[in-house]
Amino acid sequence: MRTLIFATPSSGSTDFKSNLCKRNEYDLNFGEILNERTFKKKLSRNIIDNEEWKIFCEENSALNYTEQLAQFQIKRFTESKNCIAKLFPDHLHLLNIDLILKYCSKLCEVADKIFYLQRENKKEQIVSRSVRFIEGEPDKELMYSYKGDLSNDILNENFEHYRKYLNIIEKVFKNHPGQVVTLERDIEDTTAEGRYVYKGDWELPEELPILK
């Protein structure tokens, strides 16, 4: 069975995937399937066949790197009969929205089981991402070590990030429905102790999509 977890950051996807992997014996664990950084690490360790990737790039040289990676990973996901992957649409941020929708939809088309993860408390989700990316590169440990404030500009920037990608997920969900998993109701929170707490007065400029 090809299992796909479609989510945005800070929605409980790490614990959720870990629990699925404990209950199921997958032949292949893609992790974050379209994450360029982890993809390159797997290439360097030869977890992904370098020669296969090289040939694929040569055959698809008209595509940019992000599309090459997306098509290559979709091909591998399709060919695997028993695998699990996490899909974060923001890993395709260099592409336009139509292409992001295209590649996310292609993965959903070939998945046998799709879990759509979401978080009801969008404000906390935005705060979480704001802290993790406060130094540029994502760092989960900052949720426990960062003691500074968050400006409204940073929070508004992350709000726009989530608005873009949650709207994309909502569009894909309408054409490729799956099981909705909500962090607050369906996933045990094991990371609350010592976690950063926002004490400012920023609020969401508008409501963000909730899948039902």
Language-model-derived ranges and their functions:
Residues 191-212:
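C-terminal accessory extensions appended to soluble enzyme cores
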Residues 1-72, 196, 202:
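PAPS-dependent sulfotransferase catalytic core
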Residues 87-180, 184-195:
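PAPS-dependent sulfotransferase catalytic domain
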Residues 75-76:
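Conserved alpha-helical scaffold flanking the Walker A/P-loop in AAA+ ATPase domains
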Residues 79-82, 110-112:
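A general structural motif
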Residues 2-4, 81-84, 178-179:
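Residue-level preference for the first positions of well-ordered beta-strands
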